């Protein structure tokens, strides 16, 4: 498939989770609130705001967070969309200054994809026994020359799994600086070649 990187994803921008309806511009969210809370009384305001905080299209529309200045360096004036409150911690300037940032990790992933045809053309196979695993997604990509093992932890927990091939495998990329083989840390992503 074709990978997509949405604006802000390359620096780890998050959903804004604005607390008040007035913080949103998305008419779909605003209209849904009024319809379900005010008109039909199907939901209370607090429950609906939790839903909007997660699902509003405004989450994908907040201004790009360029730096930690007012309005995140996006504008000299109040932008139409509110700036995500975490812009001082998550912004382009900070990402470019950190060699271990998400930005540089994405660059390494893109470089790996361009340099290894197995990633785009290799055969996919779920690692046997991984079908029922609710914490780890592990699969291989294989062509005539190369086999890759991809291990992804989708949880905030440290998980232990044993993969026989790791003894002879070379770690190509990880979002942690060190490799603990069978220990897969929270949200860890590792790619091995063997």
What are these regions (language model features)?
Residues 149-153, 171-174:
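Short, hydrophobic beta-strand segments that form beta-sheet elements in well-ordered domains
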Residues 68, 173-176, 188:
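Residues at the C-termini of beta-strands that transition into short coil/loop
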Residues 158-176:
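Beta-strand-rich binding/interaction modules
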Residues 137, 166-168, 188:
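Residue-level detector of intrinsically disordered, flexible termini
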Residues 179-194:
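C-terminal beta-strand-rich structural cap/linker in extracellular carbohydrate-active enzymes
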Residues 143, 165-166, 185:
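Flexible, charged surface loops at secondary-structure boundaries
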């Amino acid at each position: 498939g074709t990978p997509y990187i949405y604006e802000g994803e390359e620096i780890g921008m998050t959903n804004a989770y604005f607390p008040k309806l007035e913080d949103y511009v998305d008419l779909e969210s605003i209209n849904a609130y009024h319809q379900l809370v005010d008109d039909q009384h199907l939901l209370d305001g607090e429950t609906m705001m939790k839903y909007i905080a997660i699902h509003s299209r405004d989450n994908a529309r907040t201004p790009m967070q360029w730096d930690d200045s007012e309005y995140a360096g996006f504008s000299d004036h109040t932008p139409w969309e509110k700036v995500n409150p975490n812009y001082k911690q998550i912004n382009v300037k900070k990402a470019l200054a950190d060699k271990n940032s998400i930005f540089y990790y994405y660059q390494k992933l893109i470089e790996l994809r361009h340099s290894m045809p197995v990633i785009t053309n290799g055969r996919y196979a779920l690692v046997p026994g991984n079908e029922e695993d609710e914490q780890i997604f592990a699969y291989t990509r294989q062509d005539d020359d190369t086999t890759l093992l991809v291990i992804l932890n989708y949880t905030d927990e440290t998980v232990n799994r044993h993969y026989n091939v790791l003894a002879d495998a070379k770690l190509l990329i990880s979002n942690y600086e060190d490799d603990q083989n069978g220990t897969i840390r929270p949200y860890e992503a590792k790619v091995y070649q063997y």
